Amino acid sequence: MSERSVYMVLSPRFSVRAVSLAVAAVSASLSMPTSASMGNLGTSYGVMPVDVATAQSLSMFNEQVSATYYNPAALTKDPRGELTAGILHSEQELRSDNPNASGDIVSDSPSQHVLIGMKTNLGSLTRFGHPIYLGFIAGVEKYGKEMLAFSSETSESGQFLQYGKEPLFLNIGGATPIWRGISAGASVRVTLEATANLDAVSTLGGETSRERLAVNAEPSLKTILGTNIDLGSTFCPESDCFLNGWETALTYRTKSSASTTVDSNIIVTQTIPDPGLSLAVTTIDSFQPETIAIGTQYSGDGWRIGGSIEQQNWSELEDEFSGDSIKDQGSVASGNRIGFDDILIPRLGAEYQLNKNFAVRGGVAYEESPLKTTRNPELNYLDTDKLVVGLGISATYDRTRLLAYPVRLDLGYQYQQLQERDFTVVDYDGDETSVTADGDIHVFSGSITLKF
């Protein structure tokens, strides 16, 4: 068996030499530590504090800019424009009691995001006067210093399938009211497909010359569709009925992932003559499955309660891995290939308005692990079922002398308990070790919102 890994982190101050070393590391098949994973900010934790605090149970009805990811149609719920800035910090301790490892902590690197989003009504650009809302949300890792966190590697001691640093999170979308309480929206999730080409002549000591490097990152647009129905406005717009206060929503998100392709050609003097050694690596990270979700909520006088059921089609990841040079499942016997299940995630949450200035909210969710196989040679992925609980508070400051609308502050906290699960870890020599994986994750989020 062989060890393969690729690791790439691009920041606003990256240098060509740093990228060269990263590509050269791939070319030399060196192992470097991983910090990224499958999933993304929106589904692993929650985009804004409201999403974090409610365990995403009310996210399909959230009028803030995070609606561009969860349900673009919800952008129509508030006609005012919005400018939001926030931060998210996730502390994680992912464990595996491997007797052959130096400790039981597999990963404890935090995920730290700075977020900014905006929503506005473009209806005034037309002569029709019909509202058309446009919104976007962007999140950058390491508090704005890391534009792309990407890694892919094999492991002989175990690595977690999800969690870790997240790549650039960017969503852009729009929505419009259609008819009597029915709104529709669409957005795109922007991911990056990076390619790197390196040609060089090297000595056995690693000194290179005649280097030629080309790096390119192209955006890939993945569709998100959503609709929101206010049942009272739709079925009894001019009178009271039992449907007043009820809303339902439906969303669809196509699968997405970040990908990197590296092509290199190295001539090693006195060892590998021209045309040299050609190496090609294609791999993915931050895979997010095709997702279908339906939700409903009931709003009373100063309170609301709601929930959603979300189907995530993780089985598609098996096909993605079959063409991945690092995961390399295409060359593995069918009985030993990694397997994934499609999963259903139930979510439930509530919000209560204490007074005109303060509101509290909470939510709970239970997520089964999509990882079906517990023995995955070379990859040795670990993943467990998890219980998610969140709490949050909002404060509205309305004594603003210069601003036209009140300022809103949101805080959210989320705890994720990863349940114990047994795995068989296989090292590169084929020796097997039984391990138990579990973990704890704490997420803190805050934001400030201005209306206009």
Curated annotation (Swiss-Prot):
Any coiled-coil regions, as ranges: none
Record's note on what induces expression: Expression increases during biofilm formation on n-hexadecane. Forms an operon with aupB.
Entry keyword set: Cell outer membrane, Membrane, Signal, Transmembrane, Transmembrane beta strand, Transport
Localization per record: Cell outer membrane
GO CC field: cell outer membrane
Tree of life domain: Bacteria
Pfam families: Toluene_X
Membrane topology value: Multi-pass membrane protein
GO molecular function, a single term: long-chain fatty acid transporting porin activity
Similarity remark: Belongs to the OmpP1/FadL family.
Its job: Required for growth on alkanes. Probably involved in the uptake of micelle-solubilized alkanes.
Name assigned to this protein: Alkane uptake protein A
